[in-house]
Amino acid sequence: VPVTNGQVQETGDFELDGVTFPAAEVQIEFLDPADDGDEGGDMFPTGNVVDEWVVPEIGTFQATFINAGIPTIFLNAEAIGYQGTELQDHINGDAAALARFEKIRAYGAVQMGLIKDISEAAARQHTPKIAFVSQPKTYTSSSGKQLKLLMLTY
């Protein structure tokens, strides 16, 4: 974390596409994010690069489960009804989408071994993350920049 005169430096000129304002750059390093310990373990916790995965009342998906820093479920955007260029407000403004993502996230936590039963999901509300991917597409980010999108996490 950048520090100036003993104080955290929050301002700066580092820009991250998709973030609306520049700030101080915080560099991080992952030594071995899938290392055993705490919540570490296999990078692919199911043992597969791609799983055929059933989420009750939602559907069957080709999914990749990765535990490398932040446990994440990768899904094809089209398989969940998106194009892959949706902005945050599009998802956050849709209560049905949020409920669907929460169910996917909860069942993903079980699939990844992060919890033992779906009933434990409420106690683990932030992971795994869901990333939906699509073919690269050009779109305008929330900050107004033209981007060629490869992946969007939620």
Regions inferred by a protein language model and the residue ranges of each:
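Active-site proximal loop and beta-alpha junction motif in alpha/beta enzyme cores
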Residues: 1-154
